[in-house]
Amino acid sequence: MLDLYRRTVARFPLGSVSYMFAYGSGVKQQEGYGKVGNGNNLRPPPGTVVDLVFCVRDARGFHAENLHRHPDHYSALRHLGPNFVAKYQERLGAGVYCNTLVPLPDVGITIKYGVVSQEELLEDLLDWRHLYLAGRLHKPVTNLVNPSDNPPLKAALERNLVSALQVALLLLPEKFTAYGLFHTIAGLSYKGDFRMIFGENKQKVHNIVSPQINDFFALYQPSLGQLSDYVAVNMKGQEPGSRKPAIIFEQDKSSSATCQHLRQLPRELQKRLQRNAACRGDYTQVVNHLSMASQLPEVLQASVNDIVWRSSVTQSIKNIPSAGILKSLAYSYRKAQKTFAV
């Protein structure tokens, strides 16, 4: 593990941590930010925050030990004790407890970290109940505690990527570029996010995808292999409207292929499709109708947006007490600045 991450992670109680990852502009290169260092020179760009997520088997135990070690990381909610903090984490919003804008002077960075129970993360990855952390994990991240020795979690992470790819295929035309594919995937968890109205750079998805095409390829190679009967690299061409070289994919857009993708969608997305489709009936009937409907991409995108909108609103409201008013205002100001970034 790189020294910066090692020194950062070592201060936290890791006994119940089954998975941990870092993400965001402080970790992965994004357009519009300074260069992220690599190797032994790893250093977040100036002004960025390193985002961390701890997946824990025992939320109460983690918070009890973390409160003992780092009471200053928590807002006034710390005075209510670890039982309350764990329940607040698990019962509200998207099931994540966030400590925001935590300075680590000894390593010279600022972090934001979320804590989620393994059970909650598994449900989000498999069912897209919130499409919150599942959406974060549609994009390249840096694993700090690897889930390789946790078969259920490893399988759920893989299934989440296949689901994202299947949704993207349903949204895309018969032929599309690699950039178009990964832009569609990365946008799934942003298009319905209310923070995109005023709290994020409107070019965020492009800024994530453009410098990370190779990382996206590496992340989705196994999923593309699983769906090789339905999608394949067809040729090398050009990005639409430019002379830039591009890898072109071609997919099977037959009704049988569409039905296959629709049948395998995450459970929460299936529920949303049933509500939003013009056809009324059980999910099998909805699938048969949508597989031949020209409105499928619009209905599917609206259904994804429904999930993301709800979780982004409830989790953002939940984060205000967990961060504290001053930190919430400071964090919101940082985010609002991105809205007006050129």
Curated annotation (Swiss-Prot):
UniProt keyword annotations, A-Z: Lipid biosynthesis, Lipid metabolism, Magnesium, Membrane, Mitochondrion, Mitochondrion inner membrane, Nucleotidyltransferase, Phospholipid biosynthesis, Phospholipid metabolism, Transferase
Q: Name one GO biological process term.
A: CDP-diacylglycerol biosynthetic process
Q: Does the keyword Magnesium apply?
A: yes
What cofactor requirement does the entry state?
A: Mg(2+); Co(2+); Cu(2+)
Give any Gene Ontology cellular component. Answer: mitochondrial inner membrane
Entry EC number(s)? 2.7.7.41
Query: How does this chain sit within the bilayer?
Result: Peripheral membrane protein
Free-text cofactor note = Magnesium. Also active with cobalt or copper.
InterPro entries per UniProt: Tam41 (IPR015222)
Q: Where in the cell is it found?
A: Mitochondrion inner membrane
Reaction(s) catalysed by this chain, per the record, are:
a 1,2-diacyl-sn-glycero-3-phosphate + CTP + H(+) = a CDP-1,2-diacyl-sn-glycerol + diphosphate
Query: A Gene Ontology molecular-function term?
Result: phosphatidate cytidylyltransferase activity
Q: Give the pathway.
A: Phospholipid metabolism; CDP-diacylglycerol biosynthesis; CDP-diacylglycerol from sn-glycerol 3-phosphate: step 3/3
The entry assigns this protein to a family as follows: Belongs to the TAM41 family.
* Entry function: Catalyzes the formation of CDP-diacylglycerol (CDP-DAG) from phosphatidic acid (PA) in the mitochondrial inner membrane. Required for the biosynthesis of the dimeric phospholipid cardiolipin, which stabilizes supercomplexes of the mitochondrial respiratory chain in the mitochondrial inner membrane.
- For this entry, the protein name equals Phosphatidate cytidylyltransferase, mitochondrial
- Which lineage ranks, top first, belong to the organism behind this chain? Eukaryota, Metazoa, Ecdysozoa, Arthropoda, Hexapoda
